[in-house]
């Protein structure tokens, strides 16, 4: 019917770049009926999808392989086109450009939902393997040694009545928390807008892994969400040395799925009876204001633990990533 359906962010990005997509041919091209400024190509560029690697929350990315013709008369090339969370895409780049982290942080601090874009041109040999049944090109081969293409930033405005509703819930002695797959700074911005968090970035303490490849509890620390004047990290203290309830009296606490699971891993000890005990963080989940970069399983686990602690849980969620947690909640 000529209309585009699907994820609102996908639709917004197509609208913004003034391209159109034909699902029958799996081909995308510019809308020349629209005025396109600073056009750098000649003729009609196009991209046709050959294969898709669908989004996976555990991977924080998705990709397509497409034939791309940039200029009229040029031969088509086979490209790998990848998008995902900036922190994940950064690990897949051949070389991370200067300013990558600072620009991402600047956008996220404004509450933007930020997606990183990257690509590479496949070799003729790899191009032939895209749909080869005997020796197909693997996802890992597609999503590696990428060139950074840029950030895609979306302004996702909150509902006008959200703050009023949340304040009413808090006033009636309900503990209100946010669990989201969005980045920490984006979540904190929205949390402050609606009253779940207080004090801006300076008023937020974030639990982070000092070394993301190390699950040792000694690498966990609380840091301020606000950088110092030189852009450096302001460390509040070690995770092991600070009382969570006392810290929550001074800061709005924010944890990520990664740090939440690392805290659990670090403090889990197996006894002779086979039982295990988890970290203090899991005993004080209700002290946390913002759960960011949470997978569907992370959200579900938090709701399940809150119920085990005798909490009556209510959850509002509108995405497929919320289904498991909604099922765990008393009211969802």
Feature annotation, model-predicted:
Residues 46-51:
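Conserved N-terminal boundary motif of the eukaryotic protein kinase catalytic domain
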Residues 8-9:
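Catalytic core of PPM/PP2C metal-dependent serine/threonine phosphatase domains
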Residues 52-57:
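Short Gly/Pro-enriched turn/cap motifs at secondary-structure boundaries
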Residues 4-5, 20-43, 62-305, 309, ...:
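Cytosolic catalytic headpieces and adjacent flexible linkers of membrane translocases
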